[in-house]
């Protein structure tokens, strides 16, 4: 069997040429001589950390024209996680826009050697993900429809083709493969040195060893960065310090939710069957075996991801800090932890049984709770940016460097990547939570990725609503920015288990009942996870007029407004409620809380507005009451007249519901008659109980976010993050009603939007109906017309009113007319779809207005 050879590395302090695949030992990209001992007292940008990501950012900033870029590295370039990485590169990612990051990385790596003259050791033999279960085949089909509208080259291939590409495989269990021809691996050391050469060429000062000893923010937003060599005053700093990132953050009072994880890989000696091949083997990913395997010279390199029970966190570093001298060292190897993966690999690739181990590498990689990196500006600290938490730093480095460079230079992200926003974490993200989630994320590295996936480690956090104890045994909870929120409710005798699937599963019928509950009677939903901000001060109206594309509502009223980027893209959607003269309540989605708050705060500081901005998200609970009997139920509990003529649509009032103070806004994302009731979080349980008791005669019941999604789609309500984000402008998203280009204020994005309108749109958001079987669109599926991909869905659901699937989709303007026939790809099959007149179901305010108009006529 696979056995240890003469060279067995057990916890030695290795130099950069040891404990690595032999390609790194060759030093193909040998570093150029160190930069001269110069120093800069001023810099536009200071980057902290000389790993692959930090050097990539320096390279991209300088190449794009930024002068005075300084990179500070505490020891030497690649120290930390870069030098010992396995160097895998892949076009594949289950996320949508992260595919662009991977694409940009690979395209950079393909041309970098020619540009810099530095060999980078880039191999592109392709890669194959193996499916050995029917569920995995479904996952491949699911990922194909999410990829077909991108530039990525990707195919599902049959076992015969897999064996042709990788003839050393045992084919007994293999059902299919997901094949990316351009995938491969690169030498991380050589790559970093090539980027460093390019960075120097464009004027970057790379200083090492130059450990940062303190960071001091100045009143004007600049920073004093202290090192033993001297101080640099920077307009901005970027923390790209790898597993040292927490230490850097702590210098300014931040505790970044990161934890080092031990990851091992094994390198074998020459294997005769590998040596005899005439071409390099593709990288192999055995997903059920949870390992990757690639050719390393004439042997193989094999890296497993252990289960969360067996994997090892470097928790002592979180508790006590990274050992001061740790840079190019490794941990002691532990083959016992990976025995089951070794056995799985030997079964799948039998030649491994005869191979000798010549290297075992066990080094630290840094995980965030959800395994995705944290990239962008940080809320609450001016001009502090991060590029940290890279579990897959090599494939992300090139693309993230370009992405962050574009954002810094142009004032907005080049495309939407809110899943990487460092502000997705908040004070609720404790060390205990981070450890639990990192363990789960590592152990789940290769599990099947279902839509509507939930992961349960570290839950609940301290951020539970006042209804959690009441509702937890009645529903399936979802996780939203630290909050627990009901997705769907079950009744006695119904299946209550979490059963993820690519098809309709056990939530389908209960959600249909909740839909009918809201449409025919009255329902209650916990909306406490909303982000909530209080803005007041003498310049509050001017600030919001500058930020929002809609007009500012009158006192006592509410509207929907959008904050746009300078290029006219939709940065955020807000509910703006004018509570009293100069005082506003702003509401945003749970996942956008700190993302939106940072944008608002930055605009306030940059414009010198005299305002007070408070994040009151954790102070307020929110209950939504919706349905034809909503008014009847609430009227029993208040002396306030809730009639249509007195409490108008979009009006806001302070009142009492059964002696509990609330701010009531007549609005509902269901599109039905409804109110959102904002109240002290400690009053949530009492308010809920009194509303439920009052509504017994009307048949009141709960509903969750799955039913809410079906209801809002039928009303053609857009959702931020799906129908609109930093990839879309509001005109193509059909938000014209909310965009007031004629308002006096020169709001952010106004001029760009005028140009977009003058040039005309290339695509448009449309509503589709589909006749499917047991599968519904989720969003990001490919839309086909005459054998070509012409667009993509953004979100979808089953419509319980017409018993068909419903979806939003972007299609070319010339194919956007009502009645146009297209196809939507779901799980490998193209289903006929028809563009319909939206909305499918009129909203309650529209129905009421039409009834009144009819009576008048």
Swiss-Prot record:
Q: Which residues carry this modification: N6-succinyllysine?
A: 141, 310, 312, 427, 469, 516, 648, 786, 788
Residues bound to FAD: 52-53, 73-74, 80-88, 212, 244, 390-395
**Transit peptide (first-last residue):** 1-43
Q: Which residues carry this modification: N6-acetyllysine?
A: 107, 141, 161, 216, 328, 353, 427, 469, 516, 648, 757, 786
Known Pfam families for this protein? DAO (PF01266), FAO_M (PF16350), GCV_T (PF01571), GCV_T_C (PF08669)
What's the cofactor?
A: FAD
Query: Which of this chain's residues are annotated to bind (6S)-5,6,7,8-tetrahydrofolate?
Result: 573-575, 669, 676-678, 737
Catalysed transformations (reactions): (6S)-5,6,7,8-tetrahydrofolyl-(gamma-L-Glu)(n) + N,N-dimethylglycine + oxidized [electron-transfer flavoprotein] + H(+) = (6R)-5,10-methylenetetrahydrofolyl-(gamma-L-Glu)(n) + sarcosine + reduced [electron-transfer flavoprotein]
Where does the record place it? Mitochondrion
Q: Does the keyword Mitochondrion apply?
A: yes
UniProt keyword Mitochondrion present: yes
* Top-level division of the source organism's lineage: Eukaryota
Q: Which residues carry this modification: Tele-8alpha-FAD histidine?
A: 84
Output the GO biological process annotations, alphabetical, semicolon-separated: amino-acid betaine catabolic process; choline catabolic process; choline metabolic process; tetrahydrofolate interconversion
Cysteine pairs forming cystine bridges in this chain are none
Q: Which InterPro entries match?
A: FAD-dep_OxRdtase (IPR006076), FAD/NAD-bd_sf (IPR036188), FAO_M (IPR032503), GCST_C (IPR013977), GCV_T_N (IPR006222), GcvT/YgfZ/DmdA (IPR028896), GcvT/YgfZ_C (IPR029043), TrmE/GcvT_dom1 (IPR027266)
Looking up PANTHER family in the UniProt record yields:
AMINOMETHYLTRANSFERASE (PTHR43757), AMINOMETHYLTRANSFERASE, MITOCHONDRIAL (PTHR43757:SF2)
Could you tell me what this protein does? Catalyzes the demethylation of N,N-dimethylglycine to sarcosine. Also has activity with sarcosine in vitro.
**Family that this chain belongs to:** Belongs to the GcvT family.
The protein, known as: Dimethylglycine dehydrogenase, mitochondrial
* Origin species: Rattus norvegicus (Rat)
Q: What is the lineage of its organism?
A: Eukaryota, Metazoa, Chordata, Craniata, Vertebrata
* Gene name in the database record: Dmgdh
């Amino acid at each position: 069997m696979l056995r240890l050879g003469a060279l067995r590395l057990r916890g030695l302090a290795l130099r950069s040429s040891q404990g690595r695949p032999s390609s790194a030992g060759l030093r193909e990209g040998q570093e150029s001589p160190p930069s001269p001992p110069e120093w800069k007292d001023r810099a536009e940008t200071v980057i902290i950390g000389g790993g692959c990501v930090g050097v990539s950012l320096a390279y991209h900033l300088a190449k794009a024209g930024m002068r005075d870029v300084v990179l500070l590295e505490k020891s030497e370039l690649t120290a930390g996680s870069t030098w010992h990485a396995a160097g895998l590169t892949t076009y594949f990612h289950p996320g949508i826009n992260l595919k662009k990051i991977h694409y940009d990385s690979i395209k950079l790596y393909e041309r970098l050697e020619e540009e810099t003259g530095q060999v980078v050791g880039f191999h592109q033999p392709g890669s194959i993900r193996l499916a050995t279960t029917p569920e995995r085949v479904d996952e491949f089909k699911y990922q194909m429809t999410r990829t077909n509208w991108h530039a990525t080259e990707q195919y599902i291939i049959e076992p015969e083709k897999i064996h042709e590409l990788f003839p050393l495989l045992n084919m007994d269990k293999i059902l299919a493969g997901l094949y990316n021809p351009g995938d491969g691996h690169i030498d991380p050391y050589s790559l970093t040195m090539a980027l460093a050469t390019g960075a120097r060429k464009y004027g970057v000062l790379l200083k090492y060893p130059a450990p940062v000893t303190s960071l001091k923010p100045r009143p004007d937003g600049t920073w004093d960065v202290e090192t033993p060599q001297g101080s640099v005053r920077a307009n901005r700093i970027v923390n790209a310090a790898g597993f040292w990132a927490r230490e850097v953050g702590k210098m300014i009072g931040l505790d970044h939710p990161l934890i080092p994880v031990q990851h091992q890989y094994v390198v074998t000696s020459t294997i005769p069957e590998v040596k005899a091949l005439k071409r390099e083997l593709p990288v192999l990913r055995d997903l059920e075996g949870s390992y990757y395997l690639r050719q390393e010279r004439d042997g193989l390199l094999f890296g497993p991801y252990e289960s969360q029970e067996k994997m090892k966190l470097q928790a002592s570093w979180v508790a006590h800090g990274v050992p001061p001298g740790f840079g190019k060292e490794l941990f002691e190897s532990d083959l016992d932890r990976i025995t089951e993966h070794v056995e799985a690999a030997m079964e799948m690739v039998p030649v491994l049984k005869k191979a000798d181990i010549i290297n075992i590498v066990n080094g630290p990689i840094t995980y965030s709770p959800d395994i995705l990196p944290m990239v962008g500006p940080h809320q609450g600290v001016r001009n502090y940016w991060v590029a940290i938490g890279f579990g897959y730093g090599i494939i992300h480095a090139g693309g993230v460097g370009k992405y962050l460079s574009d954002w810094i230079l142009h004032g907005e992200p080049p495309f939407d990547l809110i899943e990487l926003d460092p502000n997705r974490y908040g004070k609720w993200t404790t060390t205990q939570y981070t450890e639990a989630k990192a363990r789960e994320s590592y152990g789940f590295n290769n599990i099947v990725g279902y839509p509507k996936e939930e992961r349960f480690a570290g839950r609940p956090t301290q951020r539970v609503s006042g209804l959690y104890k009441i509702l937890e045994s009645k529903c399936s909870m979802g996780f939203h920015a630290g909050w627990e929120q009901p997705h769907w409710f079950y009744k006695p005798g119904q299946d209550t288990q979490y059963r993820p699937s690519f098809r309709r599963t056990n939530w389908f019928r209960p959600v249909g009942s909740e839909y009918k509950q809201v449409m025919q009677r009255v329902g209650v939903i916990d909306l406490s996870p909303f982000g909530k901000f209080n803005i007041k001060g003498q310049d509050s109206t001017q600030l919001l007029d500058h930020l929002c594309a809609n007009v500012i509502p009158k006192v006592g009223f509410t509207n929907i407004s959008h904050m746009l980027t300078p290029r006219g893209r939709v940065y955020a959607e807000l509910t703006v409620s004018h509570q009293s003269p100069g005082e506003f309540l702003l509401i945003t989605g749970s996942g956008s809380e700190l993302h939106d708050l940072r944008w608002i705060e930055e605009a306030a500081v940059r414009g010198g507005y005299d305002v007070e901005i408070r994040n009151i998200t954790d102070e307020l609970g929110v209950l939504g009451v919706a349905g034809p009997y909503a008014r009847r139920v609430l009227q029993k509990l208040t002396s306030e007249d809730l009639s249509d003529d007195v409490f108008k649509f979009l009006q806001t009032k302070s009142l009492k519901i059964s002696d509990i103070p609330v701010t009531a806004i007549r609005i509902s994302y269901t599109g039905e008659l409804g109110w959102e009731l904002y109240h002290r979080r400690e009053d949530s349980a009492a308010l809920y109980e009194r509303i439920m008791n009052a509504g017994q005669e009307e048949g009141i019941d709960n509903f969750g976010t799955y039913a809410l999604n079906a209801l809002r789609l039928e009303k053609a309500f857009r959702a931020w993050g799906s129908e609109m984000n930093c990839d879309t402008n509001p005109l193509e998203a059909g938000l014209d009603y909310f965009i007031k280009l004629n308002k006096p204020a020169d709001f952010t994005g106004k001029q760009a939007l005028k140009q977009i309108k003058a040039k005309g749109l290339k695509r448009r958001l449309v509503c589709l109906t589909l006749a499917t079987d047991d599968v519904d669109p989720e969003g990001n599926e490919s839309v086909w017309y005459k054998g070509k991909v012409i667009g993509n869905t953004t979100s979808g659901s089953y419509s319980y009113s017409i018993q068909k699937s419903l979806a939003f989709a972007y299609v070319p303007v010339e194919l956007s007319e009502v009645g146009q026939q297209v196809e939507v790809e779901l799980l490998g099959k193209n289903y006929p779809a028809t563009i319909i007149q939206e909305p499918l179901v009129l909203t309650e305010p529209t129905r009421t207005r039409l009834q009144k108009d009819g009576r008048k006529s």
